Amino acid sequence: MQSERQKYIRNFSIVAHIDHGKSTLADRLIEATGTLTEREMDTQVLDNMDLEKERGITIKSQAVRLIYKRDTGEEYTLNLIDTPGHVDFNYEVSRSLAACEGAILVVDATQGIQAQTLANCYLALDNDLEIVPVINKIDLPSARPEEVKQEIEDVIGIEAEGAPLVSAKTGLNIKDALEAIVNKVPAPDGDEKAPLKALIFDSYYDSYKGVVCHIRVKEGTIKEGTEIKLMNTGKVYEVVEVGVFVPNYMPVDELKAGDVGYVTASIKNVRDARVGDTITEAKRSANEALSGYRPAVPMVFSGIYPVDGAKYEELKEALEKLQVNDAALSFEPETSIALGFGFRCGFLGLLHMDIIQERLEREFNLDIITTAPSVIYKITKTDGTLIELTNPTNMPSPSEIKLMEEPIVKSSIITPSDYVGAVMDLAQNRRGIFKDMQYLDTTRVSLNYEIPLNEIIYDFFDALKSRTRGYASFDYELIGYKDADLVKLDILLNADIVDALSMIVPRERAYAKGRNMAQKLKEIIPRQMFEIPIQAAVGAKIIARETIKAMRKDVLAKCYGGDISRKRKLLEKQKEGKKRMRQVGSVEVPQEAFMAVLKTEE
């Protein structure tokens, strides 16, 4: 049922490929509805983190309430929920979409549809949202709005004839976009008197208020003093404040079915208010939670160690602080013979890992070493037990392994047709299995591959961009596990295994990879007073070796002429000394060596 009040509410989000102008459009909508004064307008209002502004990407979901007055005098409340566009934050997108009834699909008039446009669009369709296409950047000379409209109809299959043509940069036709939202996005429904049901679509920690949950009320009413229960954890809290975003907090008396806002209830830890969870009343609970909750599952693991061992506690505190705001980050302590004490951290993907590392270095001033990222392998041992392996050093010996499986992703790559050969070549080099290809228009092709996740976590994206001059776009999702013939590649320095450099590789590539790494390390590790052999080994078998020559003092400098036996005695003595040194000496491995492992080119 729909109340009179709900008829004037529209909840929508904006989805787009990276750089198609999503955050800029959000700025224009905020400006056009007069939500912020000129003085408060800051470019990309909703991207709060410096990192977000610098990289030009949206990382956390944000929300803002706009009041739009139509020419007829009616006032509409538009709740805009800004979502991240990057594939790593896919699950943030899906929860933000679950809080809406409609989505604006922003498509760049010069580039047309890209891989993430499709991925996010399908996510929106999965959530039964009404999709409103908006074509952006029409002020650019290379814009081709008519062709892009046709493309939207052909590829996605949604009506794009009346799509507003806007320029978010100059503010052209923004009113058309607002009208389209009011006309096309359905109004919310939901009984205001029913038991409370509210979806948490984002939560983060505020040092004064505790955890602030961004919520969309689906049914019922929530106000200060209500006793609430989180359906997933079963914990009960009392509401301290409810309010709306204009983009800053503005407390209100109550939020009713259909509203989007925030609630604080002195919750101490973001883990207790997990994104996707349902809030209900403690006394009058809803029968079942809202669907679509799934905990964030890390896909990529990496070890993070402080460069200075004494900073271990600081690193732990920093990770805990980041985790308060980022429920997708997981970490547990681990030790490495080479690097000392540190943490094994789990991330959603590479961008997520990159951002966490950068935030540790920036916001907490920590010097850290990160090890090569790895994925979760499933191993069935000969005695029938199943283990999940996230750290290559813990891999059981080959005689104990009956079966080893690795995660496989379904990836779609959209590329200009000139580069199809180069892209196919890259995918095959990365053990990709070709599934199908379709032409989106005369110039662009969508290729679908199944590729092992471990092949794309290093530098697949960079390689793809360089082979297509930056034109290809890429999107992936995990589809399951497949058996694989994998071995553990160890690196030995001076006959000692350096555990932090171990990695899991396909058997047929072990030799090439080992040789490559040995050469790379030879260039990076500085010469010492004694000779250092660098060896790559699979099991007990050495497959590659390089030697770093020792630095030598010229012990013959003081012999002018003289007998050969005198010289030989001095050289033998030097050799003995070097030999003794080598037995007790340890090798310092610079941070670059750990990074080099990741960047070995095939």
From Swiss-Prot:
Keywords, comma-separated and alphabetical: Cell membrane, GTP-binding, Hydrolase, Membrane, Nucleotide-binding, Protein biosynthesis
Entry's Gene Ontology molecular function annotations: GTP binding; GTPase activity; ribosome binding; translation elongation factor activity
GTP-binding is among the record's keywords: yes
Catalytic activity: GTP + H2O = GDP + phosphate + H(+)
Locations listed in the record: Cell membrane
PROSITE patterns: G_TR_1, G_TR_2
Ranges of residues in domain tr-type G: 7-189
SMART domains: EFG_C
InterPro entries the UniProt entry points to: EF-4, EFG_III/V, EFG_V-like, EFTu-like_2, G_TR_CS, LepA_C_sf, LepA_CTD, LepA_IV
Record-listed GTP binding positions: D19, H20, G21, K22, S23, T24, N136, K137, I138, D139
Its EC number(s): 3.6.5.n1
Pfam families: EFG_C, GTP_EFTU, GTP_EFTU_D2, LepA_C
Family: Belongs to the TRAFAC class translation factor GTPase superfamily. Classic translation factor GTPase family. LepA subfamily.
Protein's UniProt name: Elongation factor 4
Species whose genome carries this gene: Clostridium botulinum (strain 657 / Type Ba4)
Gene that this polypeptide is encoded by: lepA
